[in-house]
């Protein structure tokens, strides 16, 4: 899935998160989020400072169900971390690996491609 984001605003990610049985995981079952950001054309190069950047659930503005099997997560996370932009270059596609931890501490992971404006 591709999401276009501004480098100076909050961002939204549309995600389908299921457990091993295919049951939809609800936003209330998500206790933590970790993301790893790398440039899509150089996937082995992690953007400095963002290996396992944490977004607590307090940084989630909302989670709206957009279909039977997907929620749109709107993060209020500041796009700057330690005074560095989360997505530092305009017009670049980043590969974002999302790791979700449920209420039992079980991790779920999936890729999201982020196109900066």
Task: Identify the function of each model-found stretch.
Residues 1-117:
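Contiguous segments within soluble domain cores/interaction surfaces
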